[in-house]
From Swiss-Prot:
SUPFAM superfamilies: Class I glutamine amidotransferase-like, FGAM synthase PurL, linker domain, PurM C-terminal domain-like, PurM N-terminal domain-like, PurS-like. One of its GO terms (cellular component) is cytoplasm. Pathway: Purine metabolism; IMP biosynthesis via de novo pathway; 5-amino-1-(5-phospho-D-ribosyl)imidazole from N(2)-formyl-N(1)-(5-phospho-D-ribosyl)glycinamide: step 1/2. In the N-terminal section; belongs to the FGAMS family. It catalyses: N(2)-formyl-N(1)-(5-phospho-beta-D-ribosyl)glycinamide + L-glutamine + ATP + H2O = 2-formamido-N(1)-(5-O-phospho-beta-D-ribosyl)acetamidine + L-glutamate + ADP + phosphate + H(+). GO terms for molecular function: ATP binding; metal ion binding; phosphoribosylformylglycinamidine synthase activity. It comes from Xylella fastidiosa (strain Temecula1 / ATCC 700964). Its EC number is 6.3.5.3. Monomer. Keywords: ATP-binding, Cytoplasm, Glutamine amidotransferase, Ligase, Magnesium, Metal-binding, Nucleotide-binding, Purine biosynthesis. It is found in: Cytoplasm. Phosphoribosylformylglycinamidine synthase involved in the purines biosynthetic pathway. Catalyzes the ATP-dependent conversion of formylglycinamide ribonucleotide (FGAR) and glutamine to yield formylglycinamidine ribonucleotide (FGAM) and glutamate. Residues 1073-1322 form the Glutamine amidotransferase type-1 domain. This is Phosphoribosylformylglycinamidine synthase.
């Protein structure tokens, strides 16, 4: 066991912030320092090269003497767990030939002023560590216990008389009927159950997995109901089955898309190719991960995103996740530095994360998984809501909603799973088993706070998106084989772990199975059979493949370094047998064989560890499949509606318009969402056509997201969210209708062809066990399932429910309860024919125009449940939340609105579009003004007593910008669709930096543009100051609030349409370029495409191909090192990848020879840039290059920034000098750190960030990583090798850019970079 001391773990501003928080409790406490602490276990019988280990880890042996009065505390991963960092770093060190059994990293904190009071103070402990994921240890000796391995825990047999006790002890959440059912079945089997069988049954039959409430029969108010909830949802598909290819039958729904062509590497040769145009299809799925996010926000949200991504990948026989969405509903934030009068104090559940902690950590977790996996997150929502119903009852989201969804691409030949046959091999693909996420399915199905804290922790999972990336590469390879795809059927591993996934896989094909527990990959030899079978370790899939394909499948996994194990076989008898020592066919032992393909890769792809079987009892599981799936008791619910709500009605006549406007814009639900958006990559994959950010000033105000179906098409897919949950406290049916309506009004920003092509995912949340809430849920489902959606010809082919949305705890001598409203989140998806015809809230500056409001309420202007009411709630016993509830009164009105928008778009009458929602028309208008840096004169032509309902009602509707010259044509079109009574001119843009409300030429209220913007920006600013570098937060606010700021101002020194490569392409010669990737790289497809378009022949090269000698760099004229997260960036971005080259002599020599050849070129982008910068010692002319370290903001930055191309020797940038170009930025470590000032002066800088005035950007976020003089791209002395942190390969077409001048054509300027390389080769 070795302990090493690493570099400082916290930057100066984070240390100061940390110390300040400690001193609020113990003023005399000082932090001397905080360092990374590495704990290393060496493989038995091996000797470690300590100098190499010190070099790789940038660490040293601990030898200093303790300082007087200084106390050290160690914050380590929770005892008994393996951190994601450990998994990635262990693999990295194996790749560098280091004989490491395991490595963990923690933080050593040295404290001055530590006392007995501090040692026992809970507030200090809370600041030092998170008990859900970490342990606080007092000495190095305690740290070394982290690797202690306890004895394997035994299998248990449970007497039938003890089932109730086991139900509580194991957290099974079984009902009395289910316990009786189990007693009956085991009596018939003449034996007692094992603990494994009980846990498996509990997970498979949990509300989370079996959806018992949605499948229940109902009696409401003493009346039998004709439908179950699920039947009402399915009714929408029965009414409108068109355009749906798969519904309710798989991990995701599949719907029709436009014809497209796939671009991917040939699975045999690795050469990238455009495949034939085929009918399009895409899968859609939206999940929630509420309970884990309430307990541990970062890993809860991260694994929520990861689980949904796996659902898309495991659809049919293999899909490819393409773009994501996310969302959060929480209670009041109560930001200490941003108090609001409506956020009144109350008791909070001590066992759950606060709303602020959830929003500080949860979005980072969700974004981190998407970023590292390589999926753009293009859409989201955020709601903060809380309403006091009594002293002990609150309607809020203490148990949050964490939404994770998206869409993916799937080949039509792979939509349907094949049936497994007896003898087919059962595969576990992905990471090893660990004691994490145990019982999550059952835990998420009960009221939060009613289980034990230990069970809460056990249900929390941990994330490793880089492992999931490897799994996806295996799936992609199998799918590319077309009809030879070896995958017959598969499922992702989620709730219940293997205990749910493998039985589901078998049950789908009506077969049984024999599973050997000893074959299941595990990182923890102490796991009991229950823990091994039921844990929810993430990034795993279970697959069924035929035995003859096993060898080829093993070779695919080996190349991708993706662990897998053949754990069992399918059997004709529908019996599940699981245990140690079961007999399996010899052919399944492929993972133990040294085939020619594996032999060359053994050093880099070790066979996963499996448990050594001690003497165990007989089979842990031996059950007929129908015990799990056949005849469990069906639920019947007998309920009644609660009394009508008694919320008082807001008296808007007593409000001040000036202050009301500021309050509404400052409410977190309305306020700017930049803090949620810029942390997430939105350009990865190269198929983004509309992300959240719009316009030259880049504000996140888009109403929907759009992706492209292919790299050469304008057809694609659009998706949007609708959510109006607080209204359910007034009328749950109306709230559901409003959610569907809002999804449609958001989606109308895209060129939707037909309402019948729109498909919805419905995510339902409720506290179903609280009296009356289930009846309100029934009303809501009926309102859209039986009534609204069929009337609109819209179907709901997919969805999810989470029906334990309440939290209960003891405090102040009382029982406190927090219950969410009945909540519906609608995600709407549709194919679109031409993404260029999208609209955004960005107002046109050059045109005299007016803004028109199309209000679908018919003038009712109902204020019930509005943000206006919420921000005027005070300490009253019952806040004024009531009044008439907004509603979609007639579906025909929405149909007419949809038709109007389509016809107006087709006629070219619309310049801008924004839906009306939270905050009403006032908020929507302000957002359009903010996006466009324009002022507004808002007109109020009706009586002044109707002023507040007019401006702040949140009925369905939209605001459009219409040029004055098109006023008559638009009015005629409105009349044609019967909407004249619903439409009015509401504002016109001005160039003045102010927003006014006018009535009969009288100014009723006026604000400066900056005043309103400050209110709107306040939540983003406050959270960024708490979460990120506060200096950066202040700098961004100052730039964003400046009305005269120029924004993005591109200029071109060349014609992007001029193809300098064409003379060489016309020769028919296509030189080969190695599209180089390491495990965790995710930007290779779009890189290959750009080189292909420029006249090269792109070839997929994994580092394993070079290591094994399958290919050699001599075969290529160039190499492109792609972006992503090699080895998860665990030791610094790109360092693991570089280390795998530097620590292998043959590989190091091969790269050095390639770099030296003057007829070869190399391009490094993002992670590839970071990797090549670490190899500068072997790159001629690169000796002055910097290394790239953590961004100044200490946050992942996803931005569209403005770059200037500087005159340099770079062959890639020839003829582009002087151009100022928008470019996608997405990285966490882009700060260029030079060894000396002389190096900075001597380096050949090729690209730099600039501001809109053309000056080097020195302020955040115009310089998103803080590099000196905005430096972000460099080249060598001869220009053959260029590195840059931004992503030109993601925007070869103008449709890919978040914003660009209207006059730019099809080709974006960045395509010239790749064409220059082809011209240089000649």
């Amino acid at each position: 066991m070795i302990v090493l001391k690493g570099a400082s773990a916290l930057s100066p501003f984070r240390l100061a912030r940390f110390e300040s928080r400690l001193q609020t409790t113990v003023p005399e406490l000082r932090i001397v320092g905080a360092w990374h602490c590495y704990l290393i276990q060496i493989k038995s019988g091996h000797t470690l090269d300590m100098s190499a280990l010190h070099r790789i880890l940038q660490a040293e042996s601990v030898s200093e003497l303790p300082q007087k009065h200084v106390v050290s505390r160690y914050v380590m991963p929770r005892l008994g767990t393996h951190s994601p960092w450990s998994s990635k770093t262990t693999e990295l060190l194996h790749g560098a030939d280091q004989p490491i059994a395991r490595i963990e990293r923690g933080t050593r904190i040295d404290l001055l002023g530590w006392s007995a009071n501090a040692a026992t103070c809970p507030a200090i402990a809370k600041q030092l560590y998170d008990p859900m994921t970490q342990s606080l240890l007092e000495s190095e000796d305690e740290v070394k216990t982290l690797f202690n391995v306890p004895e394997p825990r035994p299998l248990e047999r449970i007497a039938l008389i003890d089932l109730e006790h086991a139900n509580t002890r194991l957290g099974l959440a079984l009902t009395a009927d289910e316990i009786d059912y189990l007693r009956t079945r085991y009596t018939e089997l003449n034996r007692v159950p094992s603990d494994v069988e009980l846990m498996m049954f509990a997970q498979a039959n949990s509300e989370h997995c079996r959806h018992k409430i949605f499948n229940a029969t109902w009696t409401i108010d003493d009346k039998e109901q004709p439908y179950s909830l699920f039947q009402m949802i399915k009714h929408t598909h029965q009414h409108t089955p068109q355009y749906t290819l798969s519904a309710y039958a798989d991990n995701a729904a599949v719907i029709e898309g436009h014809p497209t062509t796939r671009y991917r590497p040939d699975p045999i040769t690795g050469e990238y190719r455009h495949e034939a145009v085929l009918p399009g299809a895409f899968q859609i799925k939206v999940e929630t991960h509420n309970h884990p996010t309430a307990i541990a926000p970062f890993p809860g949200a991260s694994t929520g995103a990861g689980g949904e991504i796996r659902d898309e990948g495991a659809t049919g026989r293999g899909g490819k996740p393409k773009a994501g969405l996310s969302g959060f509903s929480v209670s009041h934030l109560r930001i200490p530095t941003l108090p609001h009068p409506w956020e009144t104090p109350r008791a909070l559940n001590p066992r759950m994360a606060s709303a602020l902690d959830i929003m500080l950590e949860g979005p980072l977790g969700s974004a981190a998984f998407n970023n590292e996996f390589g999926r753009p997150n293009l859409l989201g929502y955020f709601r903060s809501f809380e309403l006091s119903a009594s002293k002990t009852l609150t309607r809020a989201y203490d148990k949050p909603i964490m939404l994770a969804g998206g869409l993916g691409a799937i080949d039509r030949i792979h939509i349907k799973k094949l049936r497994l046959q007896p003898g087919d091999v059962i595969i576990v693909l992905g990471g090893p088993a660990m004691l994490i996420g145990l019982g999550g399915g059952a835990a998420s199905s009960v009221t939060s706070g009613t289980s034990t804290e230990a069970l809460d922790f056990a249900s929390v999972q941990r994330d490793n998106p880089e492992m999931q990336r490897r799994c996806q590469e295996v799936i992609d390879h199998c799918v590319a084989l077309g009809t030879n795809n070896p995958i017959r059927s598969f499922h992702d591993v989620g709730a219940g772990g293997l205990s749910n996934a493998i039985p589901e896989l078998l049950h789908d094909s009506e077969v049984g199975g024999v599973i050997d527990l000893a074959k299941i990959p595990s990182d923890d030899p102490s796991l009991s059979p229950l823990e091994l079978w039921c844990n929810e370790s993430q990034e795993r899939y279970v697959l069924g493949i035929s035995a003859p394909h096993l060898q080829a499948f093993a070779a695919i996994c080996s190349r991708e370094r993706c662990p897998f194990a053949a754990v069992g076989v399918a059997t004709a008898t529908e019996q599940l047998i699981v245990g140690y020592g079961v007999t399996l066919p010899a052919a399944l032992h492929v993972t133990e064989q040294q085939t020619p393909q594996r032999a060359n890769r053994t050093e880099t792809s070790p066979t996963p560890n499996t448990l050594v079987s001690p003497v165990r009892e007989a089979f842990a599981i031996d059950l007929p499949m129908d015990v799990l799936f056949g005849k469990a008791p069906k639920m019947h619910r007998n309920t009644a509606h609660p009394p009508p709500p008694q919320w008082p009605t807001l008296d808007s006549t007593q409000l001040d318009l000036h202050h009301a406007g500021l309050r509404v814009l400052a409410h977190p639900t309305v306020a700017a969402k930049n803090f949620l958006v810029t942390i997430g990559d939105r350009s990865i994959g190269g198929l983004t056509a509309r992300e959240q950010m719009i316009g030259p000033w880049q504000l996140p105000l888009a109403d929907c997201a759009i992706t492209l179906a292919g790299f050469s098409s304008y057809a694609g897919e659009a998706f949007a969210i609708g959510e109006r949950a607080p209204l359910a406290l007034l009328n749950s049916a109306a709230a559901a209708r409003m959610a569907v309506g809002e999804a449609i009004t958001n989606l109308c920003a895209a060129p939707v062809e037909s309402l019948s092509m729109v498909k919805l995912s419905a995510n339902w949340m409720a506290a179903a066990e609280y009296p009356g809430e289930d009846a309100l849920l029934y009303d809501a489902v009926k309102a859209i399932g039986i009534e609204l959606c069929p009337a609109l010809d819209i179907s709901i082919p997919v969805g999810k429910d989470s029906l334990s949305m309440q939290s209960r705890w003891q405090g102040d001598g009382a029982t406190h309860t927090c219950i969410s409203p009945v909540s519906l989140v609608i995600s709407a998806f549709t194919p679109v024919a031409d993404a260029r015809r999208q609209l955004t809230p960005l107002l046109h500056h050059q045109t005299n125009s007016e803004l028109w409001l199309i209000a679908l309420d018919g003038g009712k202007q109902r204020l019930g449940g509005s943000v206006l009411a919420q921000v005027h709630a005070d300490s009253a016993a019952l806040p004024a939340f009531g009044g008439e509830c907004p509603d979609l009164d007639t579906p025909e009105t929405l149909r007419a609105f949809f038709a109007l928008m389509n016809d107006a778009r087709n006629a070219g009458l619309l310049l801008a579009y924004h839906d009306r929602s939270d905050g009403g028309a006032f908020a929507a208008l302000c957002e359009m003004a903010f996006a466009s840096h324009l002022g507004l004169d808002i007109t109020c032509d009706n009586r002044t007593e109707h002023l507040f309902p007019h401006l702040f009602n949140e009925e369905l509707g939209a605001i459009v910008q219409v040029a004055d010259e098109h006023r008559t044509a638009f009015a005629d079109l409105v009349e044609h669709h019967g909407l004249t009574a619903y439409t009015q001119r509401i504002a016109h843009p001005t160039t003045a930096p102010s927003i006014r409300v006018m009535h009969n030429d009288q100014c009723l209220a006026q604000w400066t543009w900056e005043t309103l913007f400050d209110a709107w920006w306040s939540v983003t600013h406050a959270i960024q100051r708490l979460r990120d570098n506060p200096e950066c937060a202040d700098e961004e606010r100052e730039i964003a609030r400046t009305f005269t700021a120029p924004g993005l101002k591109p200029t071109l020194s060349f014609d992007p349409a001029a193809d300098v490569a064409m003379p060489f392409i016309s020769t028919g010669i296509r030189p080969k370029v190695a599209i180089l990737r390491e495990q965790g790289i995710n930007g290779h497809i779009e890189m290959a495409l750009c080189f292909e378009r420029a006249g090269f022949h792109s070839v997929d090269i994994h580092m394993n191909d070079l290591i094994t000698g399958r290919v050699h760099l001599d075969e290529f004229v160039g190499l492109a090192a792609c972006g992503g997260f090699s080895y998860g960036d665990v030791l610094g971005a790109g360092r693991g990848w570089a280390t795998s080259i530097l620590e292998r002599t043959a590989l190091r020599d091969q790269f050095a020879a390639f770099f030296t050849r003057t007829d070869r070129f190399a391009l490094g982008v993002c992670n590839g840039c970071q990797m090549l910068s670490q190899l500068k010692s072997m790159i001629p002319g690169a000796e002055h290059w910097p290394r790239f370290v953590r961004n100044r903001s200490e946050q992942f930055e996803a931005r569209t920034a403005l770059l200037e191309v500087i005159q340099s020797p770079s062959i890639f940038l020839s003829g582009m000098a002087g151009s100022r170009l928008p470019v996608a930025v997405a990285h966490g470590e882009g700060y260029a750190m030079f060894d000396t000032p002389a190096d900075q002066a001597a380096a050949h800088v090729a690209l730099r960030y600039i501001n809109g005035h053309g000056q080097a950007a020195t302020h955040y976020p115009l310089n998103p990583n803080g590099s000196p003089n905005g430096i972000t791209g460099l080249t060598t002395t001869d220009g053959r090798i260029t590195i840059l942190m931004p992503h030109p390969e993601r925007t070869p077409r103008t449709i890919n850019l978040s914003w660009c001048p209207n006059e730019w054509g099809e080709d974006a300027p960045w395509l010239r970079l790749f064409r220059n390389a082809r011209a240089w080769v000649g």
